[in-house]
């Protein structure tokens, strides 16, 4: 009886295993591939990173729906907003099997208006072809609140 209780307690106390570090590395690599493909304006490489139903909500409020709109918008945005893009992923979470959320900082440096510093979130789904981007959300930080007088 005590062995059964001890076994039950140990099963209940166990936390779910963390996803393999290989998955986290793969998710981070997809983000790197995305930045590299944008830098090269490589339409085919960008397209290959997204699911068919992908969407992207930009920092300007444009909502691109569907892979082809995301690809066109990404290339157009890179042309309209020149500069060196850097995405630094700070956290990767796996809220469900085959689903990843990568959050980080997004900076466009060297543009005519100086550096743009934003936040970004990538949602990815695992498929037979590996991890693919299903959604991107880019956000500008809110300005600091005014001091009370």
Feature-to-residue mapping (PLM):
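Surface-exposed, charged secondary-structure patches
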Residues: 69-116
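Proline-centered linker/hinge motifs at extracellular inter-domain junctions
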Residues: 27, 83-85, 131
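A mature extracytoplasmic/lumenal domain signature
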Residues: 50, 60, 91-93, 104-106, ...
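Short, low-complexity N-terminal intrinsically disordered segments enriched in polar/charged residues
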Residues: 2-5, 9-52, 68, 134, ...
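General beta-strand recognition
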Residues: 45, 55, 100-101, 132
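A short gly/proline-enriched turn/hairpin at secondary-structure junctions
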Residues: 54-65, 76-80
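Short beta-strand edge/turn micro-motifs at domain boundaries
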Residues: 117-144
């Amino acid at each position: 009886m005590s062995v059964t209780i001890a076994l039950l307690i140990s099963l209940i106390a166990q936390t779910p295993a963390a996803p393999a570090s290989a998955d986290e590395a793969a998710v981070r690599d997809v983000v790197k591939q995305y930045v590299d493909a944008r830098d090269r304006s490589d339409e085919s490489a960008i397209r290959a990173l997204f699911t068919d139903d992908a969407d992207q909500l930009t920092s300007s409020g444009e909502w691109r729906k569907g892979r082809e709109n995301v690809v066109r918008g990404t290339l157009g945005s890179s042309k309209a907003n020149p500069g060196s893009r850097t995405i630094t992923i700070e956290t990767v979470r796996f809220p469900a099997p085959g689903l990843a959320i990568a959050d980080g900082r997004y900076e466009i440096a060297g543009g005519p208006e100086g550096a743009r510093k934003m936040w970004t979130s990538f949602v990815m789904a695992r498929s037979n072809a590996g991890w693919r981007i299903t959604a991107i959300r880019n956000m500008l930080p809110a300005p600091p609140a005014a001091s009370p007088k």
